[in-house]
C-alpha cells in the first residue's frame, strides 16, 4: 500500500504564525495574576505548517508528522492513549480531530529556536490549529484559534501558560491585550504607518 508521501495530495494547506517580542506587561496574563495588560508585537520568523491531505484508504499511517526541526518523521495513531513523541503537536491534532474520510501528512518548521522566550511553542500550535481547522472547513476566528491553542497547553498538557503568546500569534501585528478575567481577554490592534514598520524591521535583530 502506498504511503501518503507517495501519493498525490487532494489539497495542500499552508499556515504560518508569528513569534512574539516586546512583551511589556508579561506575566500579568496568567491565572495567578487573574487580570492584566500586555503590549506585544508579532514578528518573523514564523512557525510554518503544511498539511498534505489524502483520501483515507484504511492505511495504518493515516496521520504522518514531519517535525523538520527535529529531523523526525513518524506515524501518529490517535486511538492509542498518550502523546509520547511531540506532545504539543499530537495533542493539538487530537483536539481538532480528523475527518473520517481523510489522511494527511503534516510538516512543521520554525527558524525560531525553542526556549528563546519568544512564544515559539504558541506560534507552532496556533499555526497547526489554523491549518487543521481548514479541514472542517475553517470556521474558527483568530480569537478562537488562540484559545484552542491555549487550551491544548493548559487543559490537555497541564502546562503553565499565559494567554498573550497565543493571541499575538493568532492576530499578528502590534497588539494591546487586556485580560479582564483569566483566560478571557480583548485584543486591540495598533495600526502604524508602513514607514514605522520598516524602521522597526530595520532595527530589529533576532
Segments (PLM) and residue ranges:
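Anion-binding (especially nucleotide phosphate/pyrophosphate-binding) glycine-rich loop
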Residues: 2-9, 13-14, 44-152
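Broad gene-expression machinery/nucleic-acid interaction feature
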Residues: 18, 38, 46-48, 62, ...
